[in-house]
Amino acid sequence: MKTPESYEKRDIKKYLDDGVPVLWYFMPLMAGFGKSGVSDVIGCMRFKGFFAIEVKRPGKEPTPIQWRRMREIEDAGGKTFWGTAEKVIAEFEAWIA
């Protein structure tokens, strides 16, 4: 069953697949294993570096553990994005410009 967040993920995946050159990413499926709070998209872009995207449906924010993981990524020199597809894509576009 599709969830509102899955539609946001689909749109972000389409954008990354079709609109961004020199990019590698994956979408981890933790399923109760691994480190909690890991973002929905983990990737690396040439000349920009490591990034993570936490996808949220409209009106929702990251959980405390997701905020913590995003801070850890930023502290290590990575870039994080969170929100709906529209918000994330706009911020990603500004980052790669």
Residue ranges: model-predicted function:
Residues M1-A97:
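Catalytic phosphate/metal-binding cores of nucleic-acid and nucleotide-processing enzymes, i.e., regions
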